[in-house]
């Protein structure tokens, strides 16, 4: 982990493996890898995830888990997809995943 002032961790949102490497070079403590930035961030490809994991050696890798843009209210099928993506991230050795789910009323689910 890189040392930063006041014990803050420096996280960068990256939309490619190249961006992950630039963040590491710039001293980021953690990278949040995502795709679909115009949609608010979606789950990146498996290839991007495993390549970023292989190449990042001083920066933690977190992966956004989000099957689509739009709201954060997911169907049962979308929840199954998210669970499979989380399993794949675990197998790839990522340091963490990032996700959010809401009820139709807008409460945290």
Describe these PLM feature segments.
Residues 1-5, 31, 56-59, 93:
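Short helix-capping segments at alpha-helix termini
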Residues 69-74:
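A short acidic, helix-capping loop that chelates divalent metal ions and anchors anionic groups
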Residues 1-13, 17, 21, 53-54:
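N-terminal amphipathic alpha-helix/helix-capping segment at the start of soluble metabolic enzymes
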Residues 89:
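Residue-level signal for inorganic ion chemistry
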Residues 17-25, 37-60, 76-81, 101-109:
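Active-site-adjacent beta->alpha loops and helix N-cap segments on the catalytic face
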Residues 8-14, 31-33, 61-65, 97-99:
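Hydrophobic faces of well-ordered beta-strands that scaffold small-molecule active sites
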